[in-house]
Amino acid sequence: MKTRVRKTLFLLVASGLVLAACGGTSSGVTLAPPVQNNPPAVIDVDADGNTSFNLDRLRDELAAIPLGTITAAEEDGLLYMREEEKLAHDVYVELNRLWQHNTFANISLSELTHTEAVLLLLDRYSITDPVGLNAAGVFTDPTLQGLYDLLVALGSASLIDALMVGAEVEEIDLIDIQTWLTDVEGNDDIVMVYENLMKGSRNHLRAFVRALERQNVVYQPQHLSQDDYDEIINS
């Protein structure tokens, strides 16, 4: 089995695209351990690890949580994550169009529920949706627009490159959610959605790594620390 390492992190950093809204690259961000208690069952996970929000159950759980006061940092996080989850969906849809691979087809459906879960929070706090009527591949945030364009270009080179892009998207997602999660000040509704988004990204990262293994490729983490990556893959 061969090891493929593409220095995409360098390309993303050089383009100013990795975690720009959070003030830097992924270095220094350590993922919190997965929540070990029994949170509300608002996600469904199938045998392949595809992780989708059950939006009806999520609505019920959100309705039971008192509405708090949202800070500017929390609002920024929701706006960014709404579009970043859309980015994952749109990238996977485009890469599935190019390569007709079930991993993209299945995870793109899950990602659609992820961005809708964040939309429920935007609506709950009366925050204007940055997605609006934007088409696939179109983003209000210029950082995410540039990242989408770059990731699709990288994933267009080959199926292996496309699967590596998928794994990188999930790495970036995990780091961004963890960063925004540290800004949440007592709003349990936001914490619940973010923690479940992280569960989804962990599962989807594992799915892309398995798909690469079937192509005889050993994926090396591009953004997560080796310890965080190993904990996810071995759990």
State where each predicted segment sits.
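Bacterial N-terminal signal peptides that target proteins for export
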Residues: 2-9
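C-terminal motif of bacterial Sec signal peptides marking the signal peptidase cleavage site
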Residues: 17-21
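Bacterial lipoprotein signal-peptidase II cleavage site
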Residues: 23-31
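All-alpha RGS (Regulator of G-protein Signaling) helical domain and cognate RGS-like helical scaffolds
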Residues: 35-235
